[in-house]
Swiss-Prot record:
This is 5'-nucleotidase SurE 2. It comes from the Bacteria. Nucleotidase that shows phosphatase activity on nucleoside 5'-monophosphates. InterPro entries: SurE, SurE-like_Pase/nucleotidase, SurE-like_sf. It comes from Burkholderia lata (strain ATCC 17760 / DSM 23089 / LMG 22485 / NCIMB 9086 / R18194 / 383). It catalyses: a ribonucleoside 5'-phosphate + H2O = a ribonucleoside + phosphate. It is found in: Cytoplasm. GO terms for molecular function: 3'-nucleotidase activity; 5'-nucleotidase activity; exopolyphosphatase activity; metal ion binding; nucleotide binding. Keywords: Cytoplasm, Hydrolase, Metal-binding, Nucleotide-binding. Its cofactor is a divalent metal cation. Binds 1 divalent metal cation per subunit. A divalent metal cation binds at residues 8-9, 39, 92. Pfam families: SurE.
Amino acid sequence: MRILLSNDDGYLAPGLAALSDALQPLAELTVIAPEQNCSGASNSLTLSRPLSVQRAASTGFFYVNGTPTDSVHVALTGMADARPDLVVSGINNGQNMGEDTLYSGTVAAATEGIMFGVPAIAFSLVDKGWAHLPDAARVAAEIVKHYLAHPLPGQPLLNVNIPNLPYDELKGWKVTRLGKRHPSQPVIRQTDPRGEPIYWIGAAGEALDASDGTDFHAVANGFVSITPLQLDLTHTQMLPATREWARAGGRAS
């Protein structure tokens, strides 16, 4: 079995190293990640300049002067000697729940695998900090091992959020749907040394829908949240109303 591992925190991130160590016994592992932290990069590709791939002497990890999506794209379309059986992304420093998934470079790296027909799993550690990173890596390896032995049908994309707790305090796995956040905090305006205004993106909003069954609810109650995602963004329930709206405009066929 072959696994392609990436992340969005960069090739020097502790989460990547911990997950690499945990996955080594399970499969032939190739690690390729961004050179720099790319949190919030989403599914962006670098199209305005060429990309270079280097290899770290200390770890053997490949790193790209681009985004998480660039990293997986390069590996799958031009660098990898053989097609992987699974793309894994993480472990991210902080959760990716609800609308976070649209901004997340961690989820984006996994999504790029799905774009090329390779199943993928994204792992994130809830709350900033690595206090229980070894425990999270152990959980991630258990999930990957189970997937390799019992794969889901099709090309699944799983988004996994692991509470930042000791392993023995985790209550197990729970399959969830995405919750919803309040809008993010306003931008923070400051002034640069030349007197020009600059802006920092504000913090993410708190949970709005953290009801039972959501990723927010699961991790708040000590469960590992596993959310199956899909690339089709079509709002199918809105199709009939949208057709009627278009007909009323006199242009629908």
